[in-house]
């Protein structure tokens, strides 16, 4: 499965490293994308499509989004998101993804100086880029880095769904196009 995953989507994920601004209106999350993509040598289309897959709504990334053990929350402000986070923690919830790039608090909180820092769009996007780069270095391809960003090593079905969602977002945002292998892998029908 892993080799199939690599082969099927690799061309789409690495084919587009353009640093043009995405078509969507920029938000506070997007403002940091070009800088961190350059700093960590990540194709901008990959980073942006991961963000769209995580918190894309109304054509932009959402800085105060949470995923609380499967329940999505879009806050209007950092204070509102922090209040929702604190209520979830008080209710015993542990797996909470935070911010623009949905960094999991349980697994990654020690990489930030504070909870507040996890909600800061610049720090959230930068950590995401650093983490993606580490995954790419470990797994040798952007496709596998993207797959592991969202799901652990023993969850091939979730990895496949996530990679296909990221490819769809790359194509939709103008950062890539479907290759025959990616279409076949994701079950995407050819354009009419």
Segments and roles (model prediction):
Residues 1-9:
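Bacterial N-terminal signal peptides that target proteins for export
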Residues 25-192:
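Catalytic glycan-binding domains that act on GlcNAc-containing polysaccharides
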Residues 15-22:
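N-terminal signal peptide c-region/cleavage motif recognized by signal peptidases
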Residues 9-15:
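Hydrophobic helical h-region of N-terminal Sec-dependent signal peptides
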């Amino acid at each position: 499965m892993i080799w199939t995953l690599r082969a099927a989507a690799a061309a789409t994920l690495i084919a587009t490293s353009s640093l043009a601004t995405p078509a969507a209106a920029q938000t506070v999350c997007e403002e940091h994308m070009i800088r961190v993509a350059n700093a960590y040598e990540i194709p901008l289309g990959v980073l942006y499509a991961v963000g769209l897959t995580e918190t894309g709504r109304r054509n932009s990334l959402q800085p105060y989004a949470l995923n609380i053990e499967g329940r999505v929350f879009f806050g209007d402000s950092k204070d509102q998101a922090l209040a929702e986070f604190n209520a979830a923690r008080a209710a015993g919830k542990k797996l909470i993804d935070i911010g623009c790039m949905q960094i999991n608090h349980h697994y990654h909180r020690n990489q930030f100086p504070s909870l507040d820092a996890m909600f800061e769009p610049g720090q959230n996007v930068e950590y995401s880029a650093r983490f993606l780069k580490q995954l790419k270095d470990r797994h040798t391809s952007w496709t596998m880095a993207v797959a592991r960003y969202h799901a652990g090593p023993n969850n091939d079905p979730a990895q496949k769904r996530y990679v296909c969602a990221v490819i769809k977002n790359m194509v939709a945002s103008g950062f890539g196009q479907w290759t025959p292998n990616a279409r076949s892998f994701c079950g995407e029908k050819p354009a009419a």
